A protein has these predicted regions:
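Gly/serine-rich nucleotide phosphate-binding loop at the start of the catalytic core
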Residues: 2-106
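Positively charged, low-complexity nucleic-acid-binding target-recognition regions
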Residues: 2-28, 32, 316, 320-439
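Substrate-contacting helices/loops that form the catalytic groove of nucleic-acid
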Residues: 65, 69-96, 100, 177-181, ...
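Acidic carboxylate diad motif detector
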Residues: 80-187
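Hydrophobic residues embedded in beta-strands of well-ordered beta-sheets
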Residues: 147, 152-155, 191-194, 222-223, ...
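Short acidic-glycine loop/turn motifs at beta-strand connectors
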Residues: 150, 187-189, 226-229, 355-356, ...
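Secondary-structure transition/turn motif
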Residues: 153-164, 196-201, 228-229, 374-376
């Protein structure tokens, strides 16, 4: 399917939709929060949930195949209503009678998610939707009509007994929880999780500090701030690379389809999970500290997908988690009344003297310190870049003050090339997502 098809129509309506969404979010004073905790289904529940996962995959893959075939044959799209009618026809098919053995809600949600995925694709925010495999993470989404949570006891549709889970938030009363959606998932390492999506009261904005900070992200140091602080790069994957490689070699030696291969695959998945967890913890600590200590946070719109094409730096860049760090800054600034400004990726922050504004013609990546030929000021490359980022961000914030919801950023898909002569780029600005959690 061509990437440009329908994109202009989506772009015309998307700003209005975003504006209505964030106005509603701010006016209502609520934010959507996801609480993810371990689940412990018994054997009967596991069998029921695995059947549900399989039915979700069948519905998703068949619907996606029908969308692709219709586009290639007729050059027309497929609406959600048409996929809903197709699901009804699937349930009447004798070969697909097993679809009636599970709750219909996860199947309907699969259609909704696919419809949203195509909207994101046509708007240029996501890749083309792919077919689902039984080898990856599995999940089923239940809305209010398909579950009940009373007194901390969770019951799912088509389940004969309550689903046992461990609540890990002692300051939140699970018996008073009123989730809008429950997501049951099975990770590749064999762990079960249940996620409660709840609309909660928005927290009070943090007290003003009067501080603004520019953040220069890198590989040698994860981040350098405009006030000279350096956040060391812990290199989580590199520290555990030997252990992970050992498990991967064992997996490669196992025969396909064997029980030993399944065990080895689970060990590889567990090793990846440990790396992912420590990275998430580090990013949360770093982002929370910046949000607490500063009113305005300025970062660059890094093109991570393009940067990882460098084979020598791809693993190190991916290990940093810059995209996840930005996502956390976005929703935390939104929630706690801070302002996040994202300046253009082409802004020459490293080559510009933060003292006099002189712009160097060239500056190699290996040059970590340099002297300005105009004012003779001596610069640390990263600190100078962070100071220029802060100056550009404060100019943007001054010219386009944030809305009542807190942070303002430009959406990652709308960067514009700035001339090096324009040292204060004016990026387009959009709202910040308020969703939290890994689901």
């Amino acid at each position: 399917m061509p990437r440009d098809a329908g994109r202009h129509g989506e772009r015309q309506v998307r700003p209005a939709r975003l504006r209505r969404f964030y106005e509603k979010t701010c006016d209502s004073g609520t934010v959507r929060t996801a609480y993810r905790c371990r689940a412990y289904p018994d054997e009967q529940q596991q069998a029921m949930l695995r059947r549900t996962f399989g039915c979700v995959r069948v519905v998703w893959n068949r619907t996606l195949a029908q969308r692709r075939a219709r586009w290639h044959l007729e050059r027309t799209g497929t609406s959600y209503a048409e996929t809903d009618r197709a699901l009804t026809a699937m349930k009447k098919d004798p070969d697909l009678a097993f679809l009636n053995q599970v709750s219909s809600v996860p199947l309907q949600q699969a259609l909704r998610h696919q419809h949203q995925a195509f909207r994101g694709f046509f708007a240029g925010r996501a890749r083309y939707p792919r077919f689902k495999s039984r080898a990856g993470r599995q999940s089923a989404h239940y809305t209010r009509s398909a579950f009940s949570l009373r007194g901390g006891v969770l019951r799912l549709a088509k389940a004969a007994s309550p689903l046992r889970f461990t609540w890990t938030w002692p300051d939140i009363d699970v018996t008073a929880l009123d989730p809008a959606m429950v997501i049951v998932s099975l990770e590749s390492d064999g762990r079960w999780y249940v996620t409660f999506t709840v609309d909660t009261q928005a927290p009070e904005p943090l007290p003003q500090t009067g501080r603004a900070v520019g953040v220069d992200l890198g590989v040698k140091d994860f981040a350098v701030t405009s006030d000279g602080q350096r956040i060391a790069n812990p290199r989580h994957l590199e520290r555990r690379a030997q252990n992970l490689a050992r498990y991967q070699r064992r997996l490669a030696r196992c025969q396909n389809g064997s029980a030993n291969r399944a065990k080895a695959k689970a060990k590889v998945a567990r090793a990846h999970r440990k790396v992912r967890n420590v990275r998430q913890d580090f990013l949360h600590r770093a982002s929370t500290r910046l949000v607490r200590e500063n009113d305005i946070i300025v970062i660059e719109d890094l093109h991570v997908a393009g940067m990882v094409r460098n084979r020598r730096l791809a693993r190190a860049i991916s290990d940093c988690g810059w995209g996840e760090f930005r996502r956390q800054l976005e929703y935390k600034c939104q929630r706690y009344g801070r302002e996040l400004v994202v300046i253009d990726r082409w802004y020459p922050s490293s080559k510009t003297c933060s003292a006099c504004g002189h712009l160097l013609a060239e500056l190699s990546l290996s040059t970590r310190h340099w002297t300005c030929p105009s004012c003779r000021a001596r610069h640390d490359r990263d600190i100078n870049a962070a100071q220029n980022i802060r100056a550009a961000g404060r100019a943007v914030a001054r010219d386009a003050p944030g809305d009542a919801c807190g942070g303002d950023v430009r959406h990652s898909g709308s960067s514009r090339v700035q001339s090096p002569a324009n040292q204060e780029p004016q990026p387009a600005r959009a709202g910040i997502p308020v969703f939290q959690g890994g689901e």
